[in-house]
Amino acid sequence: MKATVLRLYMHESRRFRGMLLYEWLLEQGRKLGIHGGSAFRAVAGYGRHGVLHEQRFFELAGELPVVTEFIVSEADAERILALVRKENIDLVYVCWPAEYAATSAPDAPAAPGPASDSPGGTS
């Protein structure tokens, strides 16, 4: 099925309306009726200022990048971005078309069996 991947980037400690921003974004997605969203914390990263952030010292807590991701329709991606703009939240985001499916879907291609994909296996 066709979808749009929307990723929004922020520091993990960034807050909005008394909540961590990534939690607020996920909550807003739920309120918009979006079926799922996830937040991922980076191990390390740097942004436009070139400063590398890593979790090495307790003092750096909250400085690592977090990505909040939604796999949605193009219209739902626009709804999320419209809300972010309306709330005047300054974020970097990326958006691209994708296809999604579940491996348990009836029309998913069958996985190759052990005999056909193992070296020296019998067929």
Predicted region positions:
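Positively charged, small/polar-rich N-terminal and surface patches that mediate targeting and assembly
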Residues: 1-123
